[in-house]
Design a protein with these regions (language model features):
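Short aromatic/hydrophobic "clamp" motif used to bind/position activated sugar donors
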Residues: 84
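Non-catalytic, C-terminal membrane-associated alpha-helical segments of glycosyltransferases
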Residues: 228-236, 247-308
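Short, acidic, metal-binding catalytic loop of nucleotide-sugar glycosyltransferases
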Residues: 23-32
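A short, conserved alpha-helix in the catalytic core of glycosyltransferases
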Residues: 162-213
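Acidic helix N-cap motif at the loop->helix transition within catalytic regions
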Residues: 44-52
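Glycine-rich, basic loop-to-helix element that forms the pyrophosphate-binding segment
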Residues: 21, 61-79, 89-91
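Conserved donor NDP-sugar-binding/catalytic core segment of glycosyltransferases
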Residues: 92-129, 135-137
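Cell-envelope/extracellular polymer assembly enzymes that use nucleotide-activated donors
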Residues: 3-6, 34, 194
Length: 308
């Protein structure tokens, strides 16, 4: 019998986009799946519309916005599948996507997470993700391989990678049972990267499946340069490093933060005349000064290797 796949999507104030995703799922060739849609307290209650037009969807409406990790965790908890496909609502799937994502799990039991090749919906030949580089232990950033490159087959080789992409990642249920759900302390940004570090420390591998494709309408929910992003991306970059590096390495990162990241961020928002962005950038930094419990953890093997 085919394993059950639970498709978990999170929606927030983007009902039209969510419906477009659900419509794209009608063409899926894999037939043993369920869809769980979690609404993160959108201003417009979509309950009746979803239940009327998509009666097969298991719909959950949160009373408050729990963020990316918290909202998805609600869906993960409700999932019955052997595999959980966590996918952004601002994507559209290709017919054989689930089939392709399942294949690597059958070949290597150590694989815990699989992400497909991700392309931009607005420019279908342009790649957003074809795997990830290792996290730079000094800058606190990882780079999506193939980002904004024309797809000419140069990233058609599947293989192990450092991180899955939060917009589309299939996770084996065994992984969640062993590691736990996504760390909701992040709320938005870096949560899947932190989760990946936990997953790797537990002995699982992360895999990039080049044969599976999905199209992403990037940043429909929060905007490419939103004040929300300025806050959480800044805050969580520091938080990630606190949780996943040694004290010595975090000290080196802090020097980079003070000498490069902070001056560059301040200058950028001042020159762009974006006072709200500037305020949120500073708030994101200051949050880490006041929040004391997220002590640096033990570096994963990949982070240790990057330090050598």
């Amino acid at each position: 019998m085919k394993p059950l796949v639970s498709i978990v999507i999170l929606s927030y104030n983007q009902l039209k986009v969510s419906c477009e995703f659900l419509d794209s799922c009608r063409a899926l060739s894999y037939d043993n799946y369920e869809i769980i849609m979690v609404d993160n307290a959108s201003a417009e209650d979509p309950t009746q519309l979803i239940k009327t037009n998509y009666p097969y969807v298991r719909f959950i409406r949160n009373e408050q916005n729990l963020g990316f990790a918290g909202g998805n965790n609600i869906g993960i908890a409700a999932a019955k599948g052997d595999y959980i496909f966590i996918v952004n609502n601002d994507t559209e799937v290709t017919p054989d996507l689930l089939d392709k994502l399942l294949e690597p799990f059958q070949k290597d039991p150590a694989i815990g997470v699989v992400s497909p090749k991700i392309k931009y919906f607005s420019n279908p030949t342009l790649i957003q993700y074809a795997g990830y580089t290792a996290m730079n232990p000094f800058t606190g950033q990882a780079v999506a391989i193939g980002h904004k490159q024309e797809d000419q087959g140069q990233h058609d080789k599947s293989g192990y990678t450092n991180f899955a992409h939060g917009a589309a990642m299939m996770v084996k249920k065994e992984v969640i049972e062993k590691v736990g759900a996504m760390p909701d302390i992040f709320f938005l940004y870096y949560e899947e990267l932190d989760w990946a570090e936990q997953i790797k420390r537990a002995g699982f591998k992360i895999y990039y499946q080049a044969e599976g494709e999905i199209f992403h309408k990037e940043s429909v929910s929060v905007g490419k340069e939103s004040p929300l992003k300025a806050y959480y991306h800044t805050r969580n970059r520091v938080l990630f490093m606190r949780r996943n590096t040694s004290p010595f390495q975090f000290t080196l990162f802090s020097l980079f933060l003070v000498t490069c990241v902070i001056p560059k961020g301040l200058l950028k928002y001042i020159l762009k005349r974006q006072p709200i962005h500037l305020k949120n950038f500073i708030r994101g930094l200051w949050w880490n000064v006041g929040y004391r419990t997220a002590k640096p953890g033990h570096p994963s093997p990949s982070m240790q290797a990057a330090l050598r």
